Amino acid sequence: MQAEIIAVGTEILLGQIVDTNSAFIARELAEAGIEVYYHSLVGDNATRLTAVVEQARSRSDLVIISGGLGPTKDDLTKQTVAHLLGVKLVEDALAMAKIRRRFAINGREMTPNNRLQALYPAGSQPLANRTGLAVGAFYQDPDGADIMLLPGPPSETEPMFREQALPLLKQTYPRSEYLSSRVLRFFGIGESQLVTQLSDLIDQQTNPTIAPYAKVNEVTLRLTAQAPDEMQGQRLLDDLTATIKARVGDYLYGYGDDNSLAAVVVQTLIDRQLTITAAESLTAGQFQSTLGSVPGVSAVFPGGFVTYAASAKHDLLGVSQATIDQDGVVSAATAKEMASRSRERLDTDFSLSFTGVAGPDALEGQPAGTVWLGLAQRGQQPQAKLLHLTGTRSAIRERSVLTGLDWLRRTLQKVK
């Protein structure tokens, strides 16, 4: 089974937006045991789109096209594909009713071009759009490659693919072997060091396979196993995961494509019924914003402090003026007091503090990238950690936040 993915959109071609759909679809297909051989990108031009689709159909069994299903003049995908297949466009009654309701609710008159979103190539199976308006389609061609049409916005593509397209593909293309995969996420170790620690496993890999990926501020490993059924595949992954954890488990913070350090920390706090606050200087609320992006965080995070100026550290948190005068704001003493005072203010179990020099200029004789983190825990003496970071101002702030999260994660692991 050989598949090809085509992304449609001049804005992608010009680099104005990034094509995340192709990566998402490819991952989902791989887990379903469908191999992707080619990725293509084409602008909103009927002639060029026709050529790309014809080429794809000549060399692949399944062609998945995302984008170009909307109501505007440059949305040409379904018209182009219908013409290529020699079929008409027909209306999906349910999709049309949804479009009319949407306009009625908003008190607007529906323009005729919006009907395009409810059309699909005749002979296809329509795919309902739960989060948008443009209907998708799956056309099975007995004499050539099958074609699947998906909308362009990822917020529409992903639920449509997971809920409708993928089950349909699994039913259409049954397989004899089950493909299981697992993503391991690491922080605090570089790709080269991780690969070195696991070099024999990587060099000798057969089944499961190990694929390392260096991402921004972290490294992931994708483990993939082939087996007659899911249970045997998971067993293979469990055995390999245990071997990896025995070597580099200290850096392993979680699993899955959509996981994050913040999500792991928040879930651990929720599970253990512990609370957290923060006092931030150089990160200017970025740590609290990162926590706030995780659903359910309100159960463990009552609020926090952004104390950029020395006066705010003293007036809002109660950091002693003597500490600020003697040690400076970029110091272990200030980081500890920021953490302990903020924890006391909101009566939480933990608090993290961030103070330092994001750059580009030095501060108090300290170069850019000098960062002190403070950690206060109920019933314990506050601690401080010194970081020497490099990069842009935003990179230093982001790395500070992630290091703070990882420090908290490791601390929570020790809490009984």
Swiss-Prot record:
It comes from the Bacteria. Pfam families: CinA, CinA_KH, MoCF_biosynth. Belongs to the CinA family. PANTHER family: NICOTINAMIDE-NUCLEOTIDE AMIDOHYDROLASE PNCC, NMN AMIDOHYDROLASE-LIKE PROTEIN YFAY. This is Putative competence-damage inducible protein. The lineage of its organism: Bacteria, Bacillati, Bacillota, Bacilli, Lactobacillales. The gene is cinA.
